[in-house]
Amino acid sequence: MSTAPQQAEQHHRIDYIELPAKDIAEVKRFYGAVFGWRFEDYGPNYTSFMDGRLNGGFDKEREVSKGGALLVLYSKDLDATLAKVREAGGRIVMDTFSFPGGKRFHFTDPAGNELAVWTEP
């Protein structure tokens, strides 16, 4: 069976995302508790994550930098997700606000990476 249609679907699509994390165990705990992500370790300095749609990894050797790309996650229940982020030790850096098409908030994870979560109105 040919994989050409599958490869065509994925051509030029974002395929993998890497984020810095000095404490791999802590980011695994945080993202597992808040978003239900699964992980696979590749030695002591790297773990990959699977969110059910997009894969990525956390790299202990990279430094957090400000002003990079903003990763935006989707939630069916924004308030519940915000509460889980707080409970798991994330820091809300921009409270929920409305924008054309929905609402979102921004947070930093235990490694200091800034992400956002959005929902439809």
Predicted regions and their residues:
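Residue-level hotspots at or immediately adjacent to binding/recognition sites across diverse folds
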Residues: 3, 57-59, 68, 75-78, ...
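Core segments of cupin and vicinal oxygen chelate
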Residues: 11-56, 103
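Active-site beta-strand termini and strand-to-loop segments that position acidic
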Residues: 49-52, 107-110, 120
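Short beta->alpha transition motifs characteristic of CBS
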Residues: 59-60, 117-121
